[in-house]
Structures are given as C-alpha cells and as structure tokens.
C-alpha cells in the first residue's frame, strides 16, 4: 500500500503579487524552494489562510532572497497581495516509509524570511477546548 504524505510546506507566507496575465504557476523565492525541497515545475497546493481559497498549481523559481510569492495566471484571481498562504508539496511512499516520514516545515515571517525550524503544533495544543 502507498500513502500520499506531506513532503514539505512553507507556512504562512505572504503573497507579494498576483499576475493574471502570466501563463500560470506560483513564483517562489529560490531560497524558500530549496528549504522546502520544492523544485521548479513541481505540483504544489496553495491554501489561502486569509480568504479560504484552495488551489493546485506548479512552482517556478523566483529570485533568491527576494521573498517573492506570486500567483500567476488564472490562480491570481483567487488571492490578493498581502494574503497569508500555506504552500504544500506531497510525495507517495510505502506505508513502512510513511511511518518514519518527517516533512520539511519552513516557517516564515511577514516578509517571507525564514524563521528558525521548529516542530509543528497541533491546533488543539494552541487553544484550550472547554466542554
């Protein structure tokens, strides 16, 4: 059996542009792509935290160190500059490999600069639920 697992994500990146006239894709700062192990033309999911939209596209390389996160083509209609997004990539792997798998998590600040690596917190760990 194979499972589809989160390979990596860039968490809470800020959209820097939306170019409707470009042919498609999402332009991502090359440093962020490297940190998240995303290569050019790799399929990625983009989840807009600001407005709830979700889409799939492919990544293309942006200028290293620029902080660029720009949705291109039709997807540009689903986001706006300053929206906060999560960019995720996935991988197929065996059940045995999935049990040991650790995704690469890249956390960024409001200018898309990398923050120190840390473990991801479950949502319930951040908010106390009252029954």
UniProtKB/Swiss-Prot annotation:
Subunit details: Heterooctamer of four alpha and four beta subunits.
Post-translational modification: Is synthesized initially as an inactive proenzyme, which is activated by self-cleavage at a specific serine bond to produce a beta-subunit with a hydroxyl group at its C-terminus and an alpha-subunit with a pyruvoyl group at its N-terminus.
Family in the record: Belongs to the PanD family.
SUPFAM superfamilies xrefs: ADC-like
HAMAP family cross-referenced by the UniProt entry: PanD
Alphabetic keyword roster: Autocatalytic cleavage, Cytoplasm, Decarboxylase, Lyase, Pantothenate biosynthesis, Pyruvate, Schiff base, Zymogen
TM annotation in the entry: none
Binding site for substrate: 57, 73-75
Subcellular location: Cytoplasm
Species name: Pelobacter propionicus (strain DSM 2379 / NBRC 103807 / OttBd1)
Gene Ontology cellular-component terms listed: cytosol
Cofactor note: Binds 1 pyruvoyl group covalently per subunit.
Protein known as: Aspartate 1-decarboxylase
Catalytic reaction annotation: L-aspartate + H(+) = beta-alanine + CO2
